Amino acid sequence: MLIVGLGNPGSAYASTRHNIGFMVIDELVRRTSATPISKSSFEGELFKSKDNYLLKPMTFMNLSGSSIIAVKNFYKIDKVLVIHDDLDLPFGALRFKFAGGHGGHNGLKSTDEAISKEYARVRMGIGKPTHKGEVSSFVLAPFFENEKQHLDKWISTAADAIEKLQTMSFDDVSSQYSIKQI
């Protein structure tokens, strides 16, 4: 399986809401002592962990699909799981979904265009900004102080769920690990 965490490259974005996917990949890499794979044509940081590949596209969010399709095609991977931030869920929510629309998320839009909509998703709720016109600044901002105290546990729970996908069905993992909010 190819497990992708969406985010933006660079230290300026490292602790932002939009980079929650990267944070989960970092946790999975840490837990599994995954081996880095170097290949510039993948346009991302790629790791091998047992039977899985872990990817952080380094293309910026709106071009994530090019990195995903490069890895998917090179290794002939059928199953893809994408971890991403979701404005439509309250902070701390964790939901699992197969296929569906991109909901205005540019990383998902790019992924859909590259590999189709037929992939599994881990939706991580980041809440909504107060005003609709503030979406871009909201997703590119760090988490609030009161959210930061829950971040490690939330990321750990998402990583636990993803690890369980090796031995449990997607529906069973969804039932066991879905969180409405923290």
Language-model-detected regions and their locations in the chain:
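Hydrophobic alpha-helical segments within soluble ligand-binding/sensing domains
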Residues: 104-107
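Nucleotide and nucleotide-moiety/phosphate-recognizing core
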Residues: 2-98, 109-122, 130-134, 141, ...
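Short glycine/threonine-rich catalytic loop with a Thr-x-Gly-x-Asp
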Residues: 101
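Gly/charged, well-structured mid-domain segments that form the phosphate/adenylate-handling core
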Residues: 126
